[in-house]
Amino acid sequence: MNFQTISINLTEGKILVFETGKIARQANGAVLVRSGETCVFASACAVDLDDKVDFLPLRVDYQEKFSSTGKTLGGFIKREGRPSEKEILVSRLIDRSLRPSFPYRLMQDVQVLSYVWSYDGQVLPDPLAICAASAALAISDIPQSNIVAGVRIGCIDNQWVINPTKTELASSTLDLVLAGTENAILMIEGHCDFFTEEQVLDAIEFGHKHIVTICKRLQLWQEEVGKSKNLSAVYPLPAEVLTAVKECAQDKFTELFNIKDKKVHAATAHEIEENILEKLQREDDDLFSSFNIKAACKTLKSDTMRALIRDREIRADGRSLTTVRPITIETSYLPRTHGSCLFTRGETQTLAVCTLGSEAMAQRYEDLNGEGLSKFYLQYFFPPFSVGEVGRIGSPGRREIGHGKLAEKALSHALPDSATFPYTIRIESNITESNGSSSMASVCGGCLALMDAGVPISSPIAGIAMGLILDDQGAIILSDISGLEDHLGDMDFKIAGSGKGITAFQMDIKVEGITPAIMKKALSQAKQGCNDILNIMNEALSAPKADLSQYAPRIETMQIKPTKIASVIGPGGKQIRQIIEETGVQIDVNDLGVVSISASSASAINKAKEIIEGLVGEVEVGKTYRGRVTSVVAFGAFVEVLPGKEGLCHISECSRQRIENISDVVKEGDIIDVKLLSINEKGQLKLSHKATLE
């Protein structure tokens, strides 16, 4: 293929340039996207599977090259290795945007790789990566039902901003990443500062207009330079297999949905499937293979659940369409933690724990924008026992990182600022049972743990996951979906917020056709569900506790001049280590001169503050100081009034009586009171002990 390029103008100064035919020409598809001086590359490759599977083995990896900003990784290892949390989150954004666009039962191993090769510090690469990956698939021979595009939306001074720059995003009250096709929304991820449902919908509609622009142009580009799609690896479910399974077990699948218990339901479903396989599976028959029969069972199970919901408005666990599962709450569940809550909603449960600490406890990270730290972070743990399984224990998976970050963003908008509450806050959400909506349980449990710890949040935050049944007869919205409804339904739309508005949201779908009208209904129904949950939370804990836990450290901050930071730290950190050893406190100093002092007792903090004030204090004429005599000479004594600041107390100012020998009055090492009389043009201090005796 020869070099090909197109430009798409989103708005003034924000242009996307797509290039192909120059780099990675052996890949099925490869595209470089430029915007400003940020360049993101994506490739798409696929190979046929040796064994058929009932899922799409799509692998998406996104990597930010430090060379893109003219940097090299710190430390001994200079090569990019294990993906960072941010890279994992962007990989998930790309994956969730693309996955719905692949045809059902595509038997190919598909890999999409995306690299940031140039970053100008302003044009953010996330939406470019979605567009680059979609364009690479579009011009490849890998089957794809529709072209996808992604954009980011910000809100500055109540005005929507398309693909905001890093500077613009810093002042935005909304951070929304949106992906979709020309006709539908496929993926949503964002957080905002207590937006109304109408504001969220307006932002989505604004973003989708730009998605349509990109998709239409990419469609023309695909027709110009794209390869013919290879459909040989798509295996539709044979109608005769589905018919045979229906005749064999329709009644049994209907009876299955009378079972409410998750484990009993799963065991019964497995037994039904095994009986069907025994009856219908034929050796050396590709049509009635185990692969096709199991797929038909899943389809029939889904169809049965949908029919029951549509015809009877009754769900698998017996709830109505809008009912939230029963909730129980126990705060202060763990006695020695700073704050804790056991939150149970149906068969989903989290033990949330809040830990308070100094800045030393903050989460440090390094990315293309440099080094940074987070003073609030939520970590989500999903052990295998939560679903009654045996599995690996180790570093967190992509799902755990994604769920934790969503809950973290939801709660972050209710937190006090550092000046009001100078603590680093860590929440861990330990999922101990799971049957759907564990990330939203983490929001509820995490909020209650914050309140139990005495963190003065602005308002309680709750979360709920909404589901969807979509067919030719219309759309049905489900509140607080279970794991089964997530698995067999068409949408997982998570919304978190308070009575003031929405703080975070995330949507994944399995079908196209999510319209603004459906989203409006889902948001309205979610608001009612969140309010119901907030009322229950309010009964358990109506406000943050007035006092911190007795086991939490005490933290106070003080402001010093940035020019005085060196005085506190000392050469090689000698001075600050001395203060820590002497008082037993923990001290953190930032570049702005904010000193954070933490300790288990107020007396230790006060002692450290006194030392620091002495180190950075400025002497004042007319003020009395208690100082140490550093040396004695014939004409007087030199007295240190503040660390590193000493002045001369002349022999005539040492006593109210005339003295011949100053050693008769003071000796080196004595502690005496002196008054600062004046400071000459050279900065020398004139002191008087006599003035303190009057």
Curated annotation (Swiss-Prot):
Keyword Metal-binding: yes
Enzyme class at the top of the EC tree: transferase
Keywords: Cytoplasm, Magnesium, Metal-binding, Nucleotidyltransferase, RNA-binding, Transferase
A GO biological-process term: RNA processing
Gene Ontology molecular function, alphabetical: 3'-5'-RNA exonuclease activity; magnesium ion binding; polyribonucleotide nucleotidyltransferase activity; RNA binding
Places the protein is found: Cytoplasm
Main location: cytoplasm
UniProt domain S1 motif: residue ranges: 622-690
Keyword Magnesium listed: yes
Cofactor(s) in the UniProt record: Mg(2+)
Entry binding sites for Mg(2+): 486, 492
EC number of the protein: 2.7.7.8
Family statement drawn from the similarity comment of this UniProt entry: Belongs to the polyribonucleotide nucleotidyltransferase family.
Role played: Involved in mRNA degradation. Catalyzes the phosphorolysis of single-stranded polyribonucleotides processively in the 3'- to 5'-direction.
Protein name according to UniProt: Polyribonucleotide nucleotidyltransferase
Protein's organism: Chlamydia pneumoniae (Chlamydophila pneumoniae)
Taxonomic placement: Bacteria, Pseudomonadati, Chlamydiota, Chlamydiia, Chlamydiales
